[in-house]
């Protein structure tokens, strides 16, 4: 058995903007992963979108060699993880490949709900969590208060948390020294049959599927025939290697290491994330416990603007699904928008990111319908069905009970802003479960309807608390609610893509707001366009987009009134005929207006 004591696998847990990507850059710089010229800010956030929004979306991995003060050279395999609530599954995947995690906390802001949630995930998976206080060079840093928060809120010892500043590079070497000392080396047997976990896969147009793997036992080298356990297919390995952060091929990957494998897999679903790889000569190696499949929380229809793009859209989705295990989709057709897909997302940020990636990376023009959550319906005949699309809602006479998903929201907020946050939660039909005062922060738990949370709760929470509140939520149960379907009719015709499922108490208000919003967005036609919101057969709100009309009396100078009346009647008849055959073009903004209806 070869010695694995020089390997350390770790990931970084941090809230958005607490500086984990910058810390990663310092690690790469100190260990000489890239030359000065190649060093760019946020090296690992390689997607343009990640840089623009300043967030990490995908997990990335880097292998670095660090010469410690004890004279040994350690191999550090570091997996960068996202910090946003929508991407928690990326985090759990990264953690499954590590023995330890750095909990990076901004010394000025203190602990945030997101880090708490990810930290618990790490502790549940048995990882060694090592606290690091970042941004110590800022004047508002309060290390003692933050250490106390870490101990209070998360419950891990923070007396000897390392203080550093990733931006200036101060104390980063201390972090590395401490890391080598605290985080345990991996366990594994190089001589045993190969057993490797796929952490991530993505599709490269030239190489096929590239998989990021963590080898548990055995070794894998170029030319080996590997077996994908879940599909039973065998592939020949073309190359193995590590990211330093550049692609660099190595002779082999051994137990305890993290690196990439390219095996010329052309089928997009050939190497599913969370799967186990082994050699074809030892097919009976056990599957490694993968990751639980995560259920999408929010569904929306995406339709290509021109129907010719449908096939390209399908292909783009397949490639994205490979890289993003949480994405689920099925074909859907709409009378108003033609053919497209109903796609399941983890949250609104995830939905925006995916839409932007489809439009940028695959050059598609898409229309998105309003996102909805999954409702549970109990029918009169005793069946239970789940509906994620308002247009698929059965007739109300068949429904015994409608239940909406409830989430438990865990909110951390400074005491000064507590009142505003509670007001917001009550407005969103929340029920308070628990409140704890932790130093200057308050931890509040609320049960909230998921439909209220996914739309704009996060943005509203940030604005009422001046950006200080942080949120983490998880699905708890389905609960009976008085829900109705709100249809939008344009010129008396239902537009299926604009339907919403809303709570009866808010239905009139939402209907009014929606019709007002649509009135601003639908361009004026040559005839009046009536926009109505209806619940069943009852119209609850209506607005009219007034017609454009030509002044037909311009050519009459004075003269008899009957002459003018004749011209006006003629115009009226023409408009009436036009209205019977005319169709109304609905712009993309109108579909998005449904999202922006303030609750």
Curated annotation (Swiss-Prot):
Q: Which UniProt keywords apply?
A: Cell inner membrane, Cell membrane, GTP-binding, Hydrolase, Membrane, Nucleotide-binding, Protein biosynthesis
The protein's matches in Gene3D superfamilies, at most eight in alphabetical order, are given as: 3.30.70.240, Elongation factor 4, C-terminal domain, Elongation Factor G (Translational Gtpase), domain 3, P-loop containing nucleotide triphosphate hydrolases, Translation factors
Please give, as recorded in its UniProt entry, the membrane topology of this protein. Answer: Peripheral membrane protein
User: Which sites bind GTP?
Assistant: 17-22, 134-137
**UniProt cross-references to InterPro entries, sorted A to Z:** EF-4, EFG_III/V, EFG_V-like, EFTu-like_2, LepA_C_sf, LepA_CTD, LepA_IV, P-loop_NTPase
What are the tr-type G domain coordinates in residue numbering?
5-187
Its top-level enzyme class, in one word, is hydrolase
* The reaction(s) this protein catalyses: GTP + H2O = GDP + phosphate + H(+)
The job of this chain, per UniProt, is described as: Required for accurate and efficient protein synthesis under certain stress conditions. May act as a fidelity factor of the translation reaction, by catalyzing a one-codon backward translocation of tRNAs on improperly translocated ribosomes. Back-translocation proceeds from a post-translocation (POST) complex to a pre-translocation (PRE) complex, thus giving elongation factor G a second chance to translocate the tRNAs correctly. Binds to ribosomes in a GTP-dependent manner.
Q: Which PANTHER family match?
A: TRANSLATION FACTOR GUF1 HOMOLOG, CHLOROPLASTIC, TRANSLATION FACTOR GUF1-RELATED
Q: What is this protein called?
A: Elongation factor 4
Q: Which organism is it from?
A: Stutzerimonas stutzeri (strain A1501) (Pseudomonas stutzeri)
| Organism ancestry | Bacteria, Pseudomonadati, Pseudomonadota, Gammaproteobacteria, Pseudomonadales
């Amino acid at each position: 058995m070869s010695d694995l004591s020089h390997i350390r696998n770790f990931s970084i847990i941090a809230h958005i903007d607490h500086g984990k990507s910058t810390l990663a850059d310092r690690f790469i710089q100190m260990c000489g992963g890239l030359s000065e010229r190649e060093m760019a800010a946020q090296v690992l956030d390689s997607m343009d979108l990640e840089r623009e929004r300043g967030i990490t979306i995908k997990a990335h991995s880097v292998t670095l060699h660090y010469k410690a003060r004890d004279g040994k050279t350690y191999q550090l395999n570091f997996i960068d993880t996202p910090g946003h609530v929508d991407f928690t599954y990326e985090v759990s995947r990264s953690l499954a490949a590590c023995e330890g995690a750095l909990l990076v906390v901004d010394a000025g802001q203190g602990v945030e709900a997101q880090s708490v949630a990810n930290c618990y995930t790490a502790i549940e998976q048995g990882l060694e969590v090592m606290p690091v206080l970042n941004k110590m060079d800022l004047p508002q840093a309060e290390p003692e208060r933050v250490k106390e928060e870490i101990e209070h809120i998360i419950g891990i010892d923070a007396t000897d948390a390392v203080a550093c500043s990733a931006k200036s590079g101060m104390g980063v070497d201390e972090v590395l020294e401490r890391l080598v000392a605290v985080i345990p080396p991996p366990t594994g047997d190089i001589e045993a049959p190969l057993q490797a976990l796929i952490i991530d896969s993505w599709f490269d147009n030239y190489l096929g599927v590239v998989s990021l793997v963590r080898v548990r036992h055995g070794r894998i080298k170029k030319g080996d025939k590997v077996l994908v356990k879940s599909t039973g297919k065998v592939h020949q390995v073309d190359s193995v290697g590590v990211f330093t952060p550049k692609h660099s091929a190595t002779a082999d990957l051994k137990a305890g290491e993290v690196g990439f494998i390219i095996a010329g897999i052309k089928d997009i679903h050939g190497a599913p994330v969370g799967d186990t790889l082994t050699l074809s000569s030892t097919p009976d190696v056990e599957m490694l416990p993968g990751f639980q499949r995560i259920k999408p929380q929010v569904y929306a229809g995406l339709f290509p603007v021109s129907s010719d793009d449908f096939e390209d859209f399908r292909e783009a989705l397949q490639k994205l699904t490979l890289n993003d295990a949480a994405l689920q989709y099925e074909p859907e057709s709409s009378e108003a928008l033609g053919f497209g897909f109903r796609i399941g997302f983890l949250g609104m940020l995830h939905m925006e990111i995916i839409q932007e990636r489809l439009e940028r990376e695959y050059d598609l023009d898409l229309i998105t319908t309003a996102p909805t959550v999954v409702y549970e319906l109990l029918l009169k005949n005793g069946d239970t069905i789940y509906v994620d699309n308002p247009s698929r809602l059965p007739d109300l006479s068949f429904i015994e009970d409608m239940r909406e998903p409830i989430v438990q929201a865990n909110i951390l907020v400074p005491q000064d802003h507590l009142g505003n946050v509670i007001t917001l939660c009550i407005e969103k039909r929340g029920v308070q479960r628990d409140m704890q005062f932790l130093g200057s922060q308050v931890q509040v738990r609320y049960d909230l309807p998921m439909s209220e949370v996914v739309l704009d709760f996060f943005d509203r929470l940030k604005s009422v608390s001046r950006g200080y509140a942080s949120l983490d939520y998880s699905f708890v149960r389905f609960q009976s609610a008085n829900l109705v379907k709100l249809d939008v009719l344009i010129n008396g015709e239902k537009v299926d893509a604009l339907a919403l499922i809303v709570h009866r108490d808010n239905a009139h208000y939402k209907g009014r707001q929606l019709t007002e919003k649509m009135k601003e967005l639908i361009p004026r036609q040559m005839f009046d366009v009536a926009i109505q919101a209806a619940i069943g057969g009852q119209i609850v709100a209506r607005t009219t987009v007034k017609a454009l009309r030509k002044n037909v009396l311009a050519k009459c100078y004075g003269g008899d009134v009957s002459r003018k009346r004749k011209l006006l009647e003629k115009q009226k008849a023409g408009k009436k005929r036009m209205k019977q055959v005319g169709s109304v073009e609905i712009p993309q903004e109108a579909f998005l207006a449904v999202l922006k209806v303030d609750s």
